[in-house]
Every structure is written in C-alpha cells, then in structure tokens.
Design a protein with these regions (language model features):
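Selective transmembrane helix interface/packing segments
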Residues: 1-244
C-alpha cells in the first residue's frame, strides 16, 4: 500500500515506500558529502572518510581506464555511492516514519536497470564519438584467422549485448535474495513463538541466529555489489576508450 494516495484510476499522486527511501538515500548522501567537503587544513574524521571514498573510486577509475579516466569519475562515483548507501540503508532494522519500513530500492529491477542503461549509453557514446565505426572492431579479434572472425564476431557481439542485463541482475538478485531469506526466517521466528511449544521456541532461536548471520552477510554484500558495479562500469568504459 502507498504511504500517501492510492493506485485508483485518476489519482495524480501516489507516494510509495520506494519513493520515500529513494529520497532518504539521496538526503543521506548529500549530508555525507556536504559534511566532508569542508577542506580543512587538518581534516576531521568525516572529511577523511569522504576524501578516502572519493580517492578509492578515483584510483579504481584511473587504473581501469587510464589517464582519461578522470572525466568518467563523476558517473562511476555517483553509481558507487548511491548503490552503497541504498544497499546499507535498506538493512536498517527500524522505520523512520510510520508505514515507511526500511526498503532497499536497489532490490527493484527498475533502479538497477536505469543505472545500467546510463552506463551503456556512456559506453556506446564514448565508443562511437571517439572511434567512429572503428568502434565495431571491438567485436572482431585483430589477429584471428579470417574464418574464425566470422564465428567469433557474433559471439563477441552477443557477449557485449548481454552485459547490461548482467549489470542489472547482479545487485538486484543479491539484495532481493537476502531480503527474501530474512523475511522467511523472520516468519519462522514469529510462528515458532506463537506455537508456545519447545520445538517451536527452538526453531525460533535457530532462526534468530540465522537472521543475525544473514544480516551481517547482507552488509558485506551491500558494499561488494556497489564495488562490483563500479569496477565493471570502469572496465566497460575502458573498452570503449581504449578498444581492448
């Protein structure tokens, strides 16, 4: 159910939990970045954290793309920090507003899908703008025999076209699967306690320990998926820039 409005026909405004948490994530990112951009001579911990995060992604982009990587840092860093904050905040165990329970917006296919489309729009734009039709040579191995080129080229093209889907599905599946596990074992806890029996209480305790374990793993997965998306984005852009 939406927090405000309804899905009835003719309703011009519907405010969902997904929209709420998107705004919360964006606000948290803004506060984090604003608080760490003071540029003090002796930086505090907050400034060190922000500068360290930017430096981490900057190094990743420069290593993956090369000297031209600086111009692509804004998008790679934006994707990285949005995924990181969205994934981590979706694991918060409390609600900020009534009816607005924690929600991982990246567990929705549309969010990761749009981010993937932006990445590949950049890849195609950079590739054709920089190299023209020579960009298509990316799909044809230079030193392969002519007979093999007709076989390898379609395979390389299909591999390239599949990349947006893999980029979409990786964070989506990782976060969605973890939340499904938490939901299932959370139900085990409730049902076990409601049974008022020794076996039921035992199941509840075991399920609770498993929930704690999965929650810790989810925090690691949240950071890993943000890193994987950023590094793959850098590598795909590198191929468009350097044609290799």
């Amino acid at each position: 159910e939406p927090i405000a409005g309804s899905f009835q026909a003719g309703n011009p405004f519907v405010f969902t939990n997904s929209a709420l948490w998107t705004l919360i994530v964006l606000a948290a990112i803004w506060l984090f970045m604003f608080g760490g951009m003071k540029r003090e001579l002796i930086p505090g911990r907050w400034q060190v954290a922000v500068e360290g995060l930017i430096g981490f992604v900057d190094d990743m982009v420069n290593v993956s793309i090369g000297p031209q990587g600086k111009k692509y840092l804004p998008w790679v860093f934006t994707a990285f920090i949005f995924l990181l904050f969205a994934n981590l905040m979706g694991n918060m165990p409390f609600a900020i507003v009534p009816g607005g329970h924690p929600f991982t917006v990246t567990s929705q296919f549309t969010f990761t899908g749009v981010m993937s489309l932006i990445t590949f729009a950049i890849v195609l734009g950079v590739g054709f703008y920089t190299h023209g039709l020579h960009f298509l040579s990316l799909f044809i191995p230079k030193d392969a025999p002519l007979a093999f080129k007709f076989i390898i080229a379609p395979i390389e093209l299909i591999s390239f076209l599949v990349r947006p889907f893999s980029l979409v599905l990786r964070p989506f599946i990782a976060m969605f699967a973890g939340h499904v596990l938490l939901d299932v074992f959370g139900n085990f806890v409730v049902q076990g306690l409601n049974s008022f029996s020794a076996p039921g209480i035992l199941v509840s305790l075991l399920s609770m320990f498993f929930i704690i374990f999965v929650s810790v793993i989810e925090l690691l997965v949240a950071a890993i998926q943000a890193y994987v998306f950023a590094i793959l984005t850098s590598l795909y852009i590198s191929e468009a820039v350097n044609l290799h």
